[in-house]
Design a protein with these regions (language model features):
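N-terminal, positively charged nucleic-acid-binding surface of large information/translation enzymes
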Residues: 1-108
Length: 108
């Protein structure tokens, strides 16, 4: 049976679009490692997502005059598009405000 690996990356806030700093600083190193592990036949689960909680989201939503959920949706979609455009190999790019995130946070 293949060795199992859980690989994660820092979750950026949804207070703006992703940029090269996100790619170089956190996504690229973990993506390279995930690809390396897969190439070696390891069972990899590579996860990340958008952090939709906290002050940055609240301040950003207020600055744009949007309800927080609309603001989160707007920037999550932009983040997801950037992840795809960068061709990152995440198995899951999630969201912290989903019900599963709340349930799992309580379990942890």
């Amino acid at each position: 049976m293949a060795q199992k690996y859980l690989i994660t990356s820092a979750l950026p806030y949804v207070n703006g679009e992703l940029h090269l700093g996100h790619l170089i600083g956190c996504y690229l190193p973990s993506d390279v490692y995930a690809r390396f592990c897969r190439a070696r036949g390891r069972d990899v689960l590579f996860v990340c997502g958008a952090d939709e909680h906290g002050t940055p989201a609240v301040v950003g939503a207020a600055a744009e005059g949007l309800p927080i959920i609309e603001y989160n949706n707007k920037y999550y979609e932009k983040h997801l598009r950037a992840v795809r455009d960068f061709n990152l190999s995440f198995d899951l790019y999630g969201r912290t405000h989903r019900k599963t995130g709340k349930v799992n946070s309580r379990i942890i």
